[in-house]
């Protein structure tokens, strides 16, 4: 599905790497610094009022929480979500929820040190129709970047179209 915008948090290395890869793939990216208010009032609200449009991102919990609630009023939902949690042993756990076709692709994260760049590739391929949601957990190698929080979330919000 085409993405109207890819949102990233400028404060976090993993999120910046995600944005760089999304931009390399030809996506329109928008940086925030933890607060999505400006994005909402100066872009998304008008766009979604005119016509719902899919967005994706890699952020902390706050922005996706707010965007998800705002999307409901425009008949849009979170159709893909991956919670990335750094673990004590130096690995990272990816808790994946989304279409089974994406879960199959997401299993590659178990071998991916540059997981945030791979997530940009993955969200760009999210199917346009909402299908049965599946869940999976994948643990992979990583080096925690010093400016990353313990928990980041990759997500896609899209119009609700049933398969």
For each of these PLM feature ranges, what is it?
Residues 2-163:
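Extracytoplasmic/lumenal soluble domains of exported proteins with redox or metal-associated functions
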């Amino acid at each position: 599905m085409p993405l109207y915008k890819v949102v990233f948090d400028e404060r976090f290395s993993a999120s910046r790497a995600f944005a760089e890869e999304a931009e390399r793939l030809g996506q329109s990216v928008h940086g925030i610094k933890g607060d999505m208010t400006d994005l909402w009032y100066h872009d998304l609200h008008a766009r979604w009022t005119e016509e719902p449009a899919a967005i994706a991102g890699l952020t902390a919990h706050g922005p996706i929480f707010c965007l998800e609630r705002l999307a409901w009023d425009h008949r849009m939902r979170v159709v893909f979500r991956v919670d990335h949690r750094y673990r004590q042993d130096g690995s990272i756990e990816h808790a994946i929820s989304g279409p089974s076709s994406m879960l199959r692709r997401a299993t590659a994260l178990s071998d991916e040190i540059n997981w945030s760049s791979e997530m940009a590739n993955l969200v760009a391929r999210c199917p346009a129709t909402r299908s049965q949601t599946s869940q999976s957990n994948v643990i992979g190698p990583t080096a925690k970047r010093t400016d990353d929080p313990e928990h980041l979330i990759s997500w896609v919000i899209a119009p609700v179209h049933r398969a």
